[in-house]
From Swiss-Prot:
GO terms for molecular function: DNA binding; DNA-binding transcription factor activity; transcription cis-regulatory region binding. This is HTH-type transcriptional repressor KstR2. Homodimer. The gene is kstR2. The lineage of its organism: Bacteria, Bacillati, Actinomycetota, Actinomycetes, Mycobacteriales. It comes from Mycolicibacterium smegmatis (strain ATCC 700084 / mc(2)155) (Mycobacterium smegmatis). The keyword Repressor applies.
Length: 205
């Protein structure tokens, strides 16, 4: 799908990808057929094959687009943040930004990526997952080293908790509800920081 450039109209191909992403998120990949997507788009199945070889190709492009966008946001934060706490806060909230504005893509990332991991064209997902883990663990280790975070922190355990706290939220969070994803993220972040940061008294003990 095209990057977030509102001034540039979406191509027909982009529109089909967005439609497919919504259907995959709502119904699941297995339950969504090429004919379903074509019918919803008001075209024949053969016309859809003119743009994509298979629904797996569509999922691949949806996931590549999402992960490229996500890691672009992460890198922007890492390039401007000046402390481990600021980096962690920025990455945490960027994840909830994704849940708000790229909800269907996040659902697919959570529900379908692991099932597709045996297909070679989806190797990039595991590569990105490893990069994401290293990014978070490095920040946590940096925070332990400079005294921002507790010295007894199990950084791998905390990373897993943060990962699950953020991405699993997409299973129950629905855009347009009483709370925005940013509000949910801020409350979750307060819980996380309450458990990993040192108080001033602890720092000087």
């Amino acid at each position: 799908m095209a990057p977030d450039t509102p001034s540039q109209p979406a191509s027909r191909r982009d529109e089909l990808l967005q439609l497919a992403a919504t259907m995959f998120a709502d119904r699941g990949l297995k339950a969504t057929t090429v004919r379903d997507i074509a019918d919803s788009a008001g075209i024949l199945s053969g016309s859809l094959y003119h743009h994509f070889k298979s629904k797996e190709q569509m999922v691949e492009e949806v996931l590549r687009d999402f992960l490229d966008w996500l890691f672009g946001r992460y890198q922007q934060i890492l390039d401007t943040a000046t402390s481990p706490l600021e980096k962690l806060t920025g990455l945490f909230m960027a994840s909830f930004e994704a849940i708000e504005h790229r909800h269907a893509q996040v659902v697919i990332y959570q529900d379908e990526a692991k099932r597709l991991s045996d297909l070679p064209q989806f190797d990039f997902v595991e590569t990105r997952n490893k990069e994401q883990r290293k990014m978070w663990v490095d920040i946590l280790q940096e925070g332990v080293a400079d005294g921002s975070f507790r010295p007894d922190l199990d950084v791998d355990l905390v990373y897993r908790f943060i990962r699950d706290t953020t991405w699993v939220s997409v299973r129950w969070y629905k855009p347009g509800g009483p709370l925005s994803a940013e509000q949910v993220g801020q409350q979750y972040l307060a819980i996380v920081l309450g458990g990993i940061t040192q108080s001033q008294g602890d720092k000087h003990a």
